[in-house]
Amino acid sequence: MIEVKYTIAENAPIASGVYRLKLEGDTSAITAPGQFLDLRLPGFFLRRPISICDWDERSVTLLYKVVGGGTDWLSRCTPGHMLDALSGLGNGFDVAACGETTLLSGGGIGTAPLFGLAKCLLAAGKTPVAVLGFNTAEDVFYENEFKALGVQTVIATADGSCGTRGFVTDALLEQFDTVCACGPMPMLKALCAKTDKPGQISLEARMGCGFGACMGCTIDTVNGPKRVCREGPVFGREEIKW
């Protein structure tokens, strides 16, 4: 973990209430897909944790949904604006633990970290396939970006306005060895009830400090209490008490 002063290179809407934020600066602390940044927003006491969608040697891309005052303020920031962030937080996905074919299942904004994971899987010679769930067509994002990587991608919407009608569990692809998922807890529970394949689950939680000191994001696991910000956000599916 390091503290970095990032410069906004891009901050633009990509779907209903969802923005893509590209930051330029030091990314050396980012070592795995599924990690996150904790952004300091002026006027707000707590930092805002946002999962990493993609990164390279000079920039990091985040996707976020406007859900309150902090993210509303963030959505108004323009290129050139400086943001203070704690970078490279959390325990990310273990690419080596993924099978030859890995199902990436994302729900809403939980799709974000799976894009970076897809790129890492491809770089490791593995085959990711994606099933992404949204409420309606206006909410869909990154379908084309996944497909541009050559990833077989299926979209499910609750109202049937785009792709398969229903949820990610209604659109599961048949052939995969492992599963990696991120999204709302009901989606994750339903997914793990539908398939018994080994996998990794990225949990969403409210956080205080973002680096394990405050214990505010603790969950109960089969191995006792664990911090989503420190031991997570990615856990083995077998660790989670559903």
Model-derived features with residue positions:
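Ferredoxin-reductase
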Residues: 2-81
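Structural signal for conserved beta-strand scaffold positions within catalytic alpha/beta enzyme cores
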Residues: 10, 54, 155, 201-203, ...
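Short, Lys/Arg- and Gly-enriched loop/turn segments at beta-strand edges
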Residues: 45-52, 90-97, 229
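FNR/FR-type flavoprotein reductase catalytic core
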Residues: 69-206
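Local cysteine-cluster metal-coordination motifs and their immediate loop/turn environment
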Residues: 113, 204-233
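Short microdomains enriched in Cys/His and/or Lys/Arg
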Residues: 233-242
